[in-house]
């Protein structure tokens, strides 16, 4: 929160004019709706932003600056994802944007995604608790030009490339934190991803034969942090009897 600290500014200043101005002020925060699915205040703001950018409405249809209709296709491989997209598509329609959902089989989906042949799609990515060279496949300019990479948004930013290298080359935790915060400001200001939905719980099934820490590590990996479980002999004996 707040403007960049002096240490962050040192990393960001070389890219002033190449990144959005809000990188140097309060960090960008995605809008928060009223939860109704049709937040009129946000829709009015969206209309204003589109109009200001030259995306006008004619005969009820939103047009691109070149006069062509504004069309947007969401590509998914699971019919079960349709309810998650329906409110988004409905609101885009309210704005005059011709949005649609295309469900394809997993093979075709994977082929199209790896070839970057889509307008928008949904993905869930897991990141390391300590950022490092694993960021390149997701955010670097090189990965944007590599078919099959995780950089589905096609992020190609010299500023992001440089900050990734600062993160990888950090000599200590303090420098790593500064570089990550600078990266976060640039990434968020780019509006590359749209947060969509999440589940507050993940159901898993297992025999009651394990011990668990009273408080799981904050950034533990995996559902329920199974790498922090241990076999409890007493529980295991009871579970074996129940099998």
Name each region found by the language model:
Residues 34-35:
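The substrate-binding groove and active-site-proximal loops of carbohydrate-active enzymes
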Residues 101-111:
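Short helix-initiation/N-cap motifs at beta->coil->alpha
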Residues 43-73:
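Immediate post-signal peptide segment of exported/extracytoplasmic ligand-binding proteins
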Residues 88-99:
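Short alpha-helix C-terminal cap/hinge motif
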Residues 68-78, 99-102, 119:
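Short, well-ordered beta-strand elements
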Residues 1-30, 44-47, 79-90, 110-243:
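Detector for C-terminal structural segments
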Residues 58-64, 100-103, 175, 179, ...:
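Surface-exposed patches in mature extracellular/periplasmic domains of secreted proteins
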